[in-house]
Amino acid sequence: MTRHFCASVFVIDPDTKKILLVKHKKFNKWVQPGGHIEENETPEEAALRETYEEPRVKVKLLGERFPREDDFIRPLGIQRNTNNQGDLHIDITYVGIPVNKIDTTVSNESTDSGWFDKMELLYLNVFPDIRITYDYIMREVIK
């Protein structure tokens, strides 16, 4: 089994309460922006890079830094996903808010991107944990 370390960001616009999602080419599902952590890259750097590469949105990651200012931001969580080939993807997930209010674009890894509210999320083709995580973020992080 090959292990892949990844980073992703649940980007939430606090004004509209919408979540930013990209439509993944391989899965044909809407997912949070993210991807593999590159060599000599921290999870935070990968999360910020992937969010800018895919939908072209710059974000500020939310979370606490313990115990020193130069420590990493505490992620929302770590997800474990296994693909059809048996590869394990360990995804360090963050919450972020957009710094720039520009329209999203599409990368070579996705077919579409957009902002969705809670009602729209109910009808999108997403993995179940996307809806669960959105509700948790709205309840515990964004408030």
For each feature predicted by the language model, list its residue ranges:
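Conserved Nudix-box catalytic region and its N-terminal flanking loop in Nudix hydrolases
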Residues: 17-60, 66
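Short connector loops at helix/strand junctions that flank enzyme active sites
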Residues: 2-6, 25, 32, 85-91
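Conserved N-terminal beta-strand and adjoining loop/helix that marks the start
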Residues: 1-18, 92
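C-terminal alpha-helix
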Residues: 136-141
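NUDIX/MutT-family hydrolases
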Residues: 93-95, 104-135
